Amino acid sequence: MKSKVFAGIALLGAMTLAATACSGGSGGGGDDDTITVGFAQTGSESGWRSANTESMKAAFSEDEGFELIFNAADNDPAAQISAVRDFISRGVDAIVVAPIVEDGWDDVLQEASDADIPVILEDRTVTAPEDLYAAWVGLDFTKEGVMAGEWAAEAFGDTPTKMVVLEGTTGSAPANDRAEGFAQAIEGTGIETIDSQTGDFTRDGGKTVMEGFIQKYGIEGIDLLYAHNDDMALGAIEAIEAAGGVPGQDIQIVSIDAVKDGMQALIDGKINFIVECNPLLGDLAAGLVRDVLAGEDVEKTHFVEDQTFTQEQAAEVIDSRAY
């Protein structure tokens, strides 16, 4: 059953993003000390995802004692499940998955369990029974939505406010949970969702959907945009500017991720508020793989703490951030 309320521990502290590459190994070989890991990534749809991939490659590098078999599924759930089955057939020591969507994982996770290959979930969650995977490490997406919604509730209050939403990939944990958390936070305010469509977490998708919103409602008919990630917000900014509007003023924008391009847009006043979603999960995932393979008992869920940024706060930290 779906675990929406995680009872895991919050993991604090900075994580370093190193610029190392993964090996191109073909299977579960290597010397006795090398741990072979298959990593099924969602794709390369956003700046956040690219930073997450680099963090994973650095943590699972040869220098760290790993052989990494990497697959990016281009946001295709069927292709991602096929990649996991390929890892199983190769006899890897462990599998790490950033699930594109929450549903449809029961069978392949059971296959991994039958092959005695532990699976670590990274970033996103699944609805499969918890005994089919060893652990999960990632962010509290519902809390991110709540924090974004709390800013909107404070900024607009009881003022009648027309909001449009750029959703993440349909069926994905961050899209589902960020929507749920935001809705909780704005309950009882004057904010009304007049339209909500998926931009699939991509900049092009955000631009295209926002163009449709503007054509339908006009710049003057939209007060607030809630984007489930920065890349979609950045695409929406392009659409607003192309229509003659001023992002951050004519249409206020709240977004989630805090990647560098998004933070710069916040500093420039084109985004009004950003909730962080830390992509640097590699070291934590690698540590979990080692612990699980060593037979240690590990917590099922592991949260990484997020923070929020105003324009002034973004200006103070942007030069020191790794992503």
Can you name each region flagged by the protein language model?
Residues 2-8, 22-323:
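A residue-level marker of the well-folded mature domains of exported/periplasmic proteins
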Residues 16-21:
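C-terminal motif of bacterial Sec signal peptides marking the signal peptidase cleavage site
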